[in-house]
From Swiss-Prot:
Single Gene Ontology MF annotation: rRNA binding
A GO CC annotation given for this chain: small ribosomal subunit
Pfam families per the UniProt record, alphabetical: Ribosomal_S7
Listed NCBIfam families: rpsG_bact (TIGR01029)
Gene3D superfamilies the UniProt entry points to: Ribosomal protein S7 domain (1.10.455.10)
Its job: One of the primary rRNA binding proteins, it binds directly to 16S rRNA where it nucleates assembly of the head domain of the 30S subunit. Is located at the subunit interface close to the decoding center, probably blocks exit of the E-site tRNA.
Designated name of the protein: Small ribosomal subunit protein uS7
BP terms from Gene Ontology: translation
Record key words, sorted: Ribonucleoprotein, Ribosomal protein, RNA-binding, rRNA-binding, tRNA-binding
Subunit structure: Part of the 30S ribosomal subunit. Contacts proteins S9 and S11.
Family assignment from sequence similarity: Belongs to the universal ribosomal protein uS7 family.
InterPro entries: Ribosomal_uS7, Ribosomal_uS7_bac/org-type, Ribosomal_uS7_CS, Ribosomal_uS7_dom, Ribosomal_uS7_dom_sf
């Protein structure tokens, strides 16, 4: 453990088009091999496509999708004696946002549309409507926490 405490959070540089920290985080999550301009093109294309399909504000659609994907509970492994228990714990806000972005981008990559822009756009729209693989992942996570509720007294 460091003696000076945890490292301070660095401020996010907001994206130039929407000025939203959430869009900036999404761009950074899509980023591969340091190609930021490519990641920006993918994300902005997906958001513009979402605007065209839904007819609303794309950042609002992204926020709605994030609310539908963010987990509130997860399970953590805890070793007690010789047994390992899956202990349900609450998820901190920063981690829930990070998990939601990771799931959105990860399940976008697994989709079958032709370009990453289309995949991300459709996953965002599906998630904002309560559908899609990322929302299913959140439901599975909550179900796992619910089924292991008996071990909640082991949480730390």
């Amino acid at each position: 453990m460091p003696r000076k405490g945890p490292a301070p959070k660095r401020p996010l540089v907001l994206d130039p088009v929407y000025g939203s920290p959430l869009v900036t985080q999404l761009i950074n999550k899509v980023l591969v091999d340091g190609k930021k301009s490519t990641a920006e093109r993918i994300v902005y294309g997906a958001l513009e496509g979402a605007r065209a399909k839904s007819g609303g504000d794309p950042v609002a659609a992204l926020k709605k999708a994030m609310e539908n994907v963010k987990p509130s509970l997860e399970v953590r492994s805890r070793r007690v004696g010789g047994a390992t228990y899956q202990v349900p714990v609450e998820v901190k806000p920063g981690r829930s946002t990070a998990l939601a972005l990771r799931w959105l981008v990860g399940y976008s990559k697994a989709r079958r549309e032709k370009t990453m822009t289309e995949r991300l756009q459709n996953e965002i729209l599906d998630a904002s409507n309560g559908l899609g693989a990322a929302v299913k992942r959140r439901e599975d996570t909550h179900k796992m926490a619910e089924s292991n509720k008996a071990f909640a007294h082991y949480r730390w």
